[in-house]
UniProtKB/Swiss-Prot annotation:
Reported cofactor(s): a metal cation; thiamine diphosphate
TM region(s), chain numbering: none
Pathway(s) per entry: Plant hormone metabolism; auxin biosynthesis
Co-factor binding comment: Binds 1 metal ion per subunit.
Residues reported in the UniProt entry to bind Mg(2+): D429, N456
UniProt: thiamine diphosphate binding residues: E48
Annotated GO MF terms: indolepyruvate decarboxylase activity; magnesium ion binding; pyruvate decarboxylase activity; thiamine pyrophosphate binding
Similarity-based family: Belongs to the TPP enzyme family.
Catalytic activity: indole-3-pyruvate + H(+) = indole-3-acetaldehyde + CO2
E.C. numbers: 4.1.1.74
Official protein name in the record: Indole-3-pyruvate decarboxylase
UniProt keyword list: Decarboxylase, Lyase, Magnesium, Metal-binding, Thiamine pyrophosphate
GO cellular component, one term: cytosol
Length: 545
């Protein structure tokens, strides 16, 4: 079996559903094998950042491996930012890079695409991946592939594989199973017992769920765990959309001073806060009204569980959830606490200008009228804060890393592995300038996302923190006018009535991407972003309790 074929089969066997990429001369042999064997569908895009974002989204959507293939140097370095974001947000993207042949560096000449040395790229990716391998030895390649892919699955973070172009067709053995990761069964049982004891002894326990629950495909089991625990459930900012289909869905999303006051009180006054799969990031917790004392929480994350001042190591989240379920009898109790979050509805379809919350109401009205909720791919900015108030079938966004440019390629990547389900993308004009042009690939890829573009001709979120800076002003690019040339339909809307009509048409039209360019006056923010900004200013102006 050829090395490239063995790698592709190993990826498919481990759940990968597609490969996103852009070829280059050092990667041409690998792409040839990928195209001819069709082991994984190959989806090419226009710029490497989008390749990384699309692979990230495919991994998030399917709770499995995403695959991004690029050429050496000029291609791989272009994808560093997207992979760094995937690392930060625990998305298992497999980066495959072509490379110079094993003897090409021996001629005494510098090779095109190389950085400082031929090894520079490998060293750069060591900083943003959890396992790496250069597949330059056919005898060792299968074991190296298994080791690296096993790390991606166990740790839910990106990994890096580099294939010299003269090794692509080398004969190798099939790739075996992933190496076993250590789990101390006695420690796992003791940990589960201690977690349950802490939750039972608390007077105000709360379960807070975050991204690892989805990354490891545990939503159904965690929904059952929440039911058996019978405690209030909330999500983090990054976990928004988790357990949406659970019998008793979460009460809402914790955003500290920017969010629902009752949820904020519930979380911050809890004496038994169970942070399940939660990233302890500033976007999740820096806007707390009162500083949460992590010494009084239970934190399960990154194959470890911390209670107070001690930590259980080598505790996989899936194993912990199973052990907790074994220690709890089945229950049909409903979760205690307030009513679930009430989404804004009732758009007034009139001649008034569009505000971000009008977009949320327009989307929610369609769902209330019987439209099946769509998964939302959101970019960074007020579009993400507005999405927090939309009814959805899941939300993916760079909520922690907070990079721009994720939204459009993420929507493309998600729909490519969705089995035909449509994706709703929300994006600002600043981020659209970066990666929105990837929509030109939708016709060739056979997908038709709906894209709502928040156009205020501004880096508006940056303006909220530094309003005096003129560099926040952007020009009006008239994005909707360009949609037809890229194979889609575009419409610019300025009023709430036009917004409703455009959204109705977009949902009714299949086979072409739909771009709704919603013109929003500068300075008009979603309710959630406005509270977030006010809360940040208040917190920075006065010491915390």
């Amino acid at each position: 079996m050829k090395l490239a074929e063995a790698l592709l089969r190993a990826l498919k066997d481990r759940g990968a559903q597609a490969m996103f990429g852009i070829p280059g001369d050092f990667a041409l042999p690998f792409f040839k094998v990928a195209e001819e064997t069709q082991i994984l569908p190959l989806h090419t895009l226009s710029h490497e950042p989008a390749v990384g974002f699309a692979a990230d989204a495919a991994a998030r959507y399917s709770s499995t491996l995403g695959v991004a293939a690029v050429t050496y140097g000029a291609g791989a370095f272009n994808m560093v930012n997207a992979v760094a974001g995937a690392y930060a947000e625990k998305s298992p993207v497999v980066v495959i890079s072509g490379a110079p042949g094993t003897t090409e560096g021996n001629a005494g000449l510098l090779l095109h695409h190389q950085g400082r040395t031929l090894d520079t790229q490998f060293q750069v990716f060591k900083e943003i991946t959890v396992a790496q391998a250069r597949l330059d030895d056919p005898a060792k390649a299968p074991a190296e592939i298994a080791r690296v892919l096993g790390a991606a699955r166990a740790l839910s973070r990106p990994v890096y594989l580099e294939i010299p172009r003269n090794m692509v067709n080398a004969e190798v053995e099939p790739v075996g199973d992933d190496p076993a990761w250590p789990v101390d069964r006695d420690a796992l049982a003791a940990c589960a017992d201690e977690v349950l004891a802490a939750m039972r002894s608390a007077t105000s326990p709360v379960l807070m769920v975050c991204v690892e629950v989805r990354r490891y495909g545990l939503e159904a089991k965690v929904a059952e765990l929440a039911q058996r625990l019978g405690v209030p459930v909330v999500t983090t900012f990054m976990g928004r959309g988790l357990l949406a289909d659970a019998p008793t869905p979460p009460l809402g999303t914790y955003i500290g001073v920017a969010g629902d006051a009752e949820i904020t009180r519930l979380v911050e006054e809890s004496d038994g806060l169970f942070l399940l799969g939660a990233i302890l990031s500033d976007t999740n917790f820096a806007v707390s009204q009162r500083k949460i004392d992590l010494r009084k929480t239970i934190h399960a994350f990154d194959r470890a569980v911390t209670l107070g001042y001690h930590t259980y190591a080598d505790i996989p989240l899936a194993g912990l959830v199973d052990a907790l379920l074994e220690g709890l009898p089945p229950s049909d109790r409903t979760t205690r606490g307030k009513e679930p979050h009430a989404y804004p509805t009732g758009l007034q379809a009139d001649g008034e200008p569009i505000a971000p919350m009008d977009i949320a109401r327009a989307v929610n009205d369609r769902v209330r009228a019987g439209q099946e909720p769509l998964l939302i791919a959101a970019d960074m900015g007020d579009c993400l804060f507005t999405a927090m108030d939309m009814i959805d079938a899941g939300l993916m966004a760079p909520g922690y890393y907070a990079g721009m440019g994720f939204g459009v390629p993420a929507g493309i990547g998600a729909q490519c592995v969705s089995g035909g389900k449509r994706i709703l993308t929300v994006v600002g004009d600043g981020a659209f300038q970066m990666t929105g042009w990837e929509l030109g690939n939708c016709r060739r890829l056979g997908i038709d996302p709906i894209v709502i573009l928040f156009n205020n001709a501004s880096w508006e979120m940056l303006r909220t923190f530094q309003p005096e800076s003129a560099f926040n002003d952007l020009d009006d690019w008239r994005f909707a006018d360009m949609a037809a040339g890229m194979g889609g339909d575009g419409v610019r809307v300025r009023t709430r009535a036009e917004l409703k009509a455009a959204l109705d048409k977009a949902f009714a039209t299949r086979g072409r991407f739909q771009l709704i360019e919603a013109m929003i006056p500068r300075g008009v923010l979603s309710d959630t972003l406005a509270r977030f900004v006010q809360g940040q200013k208040r917190l920075h102006a006065a010491p915390r309790e």
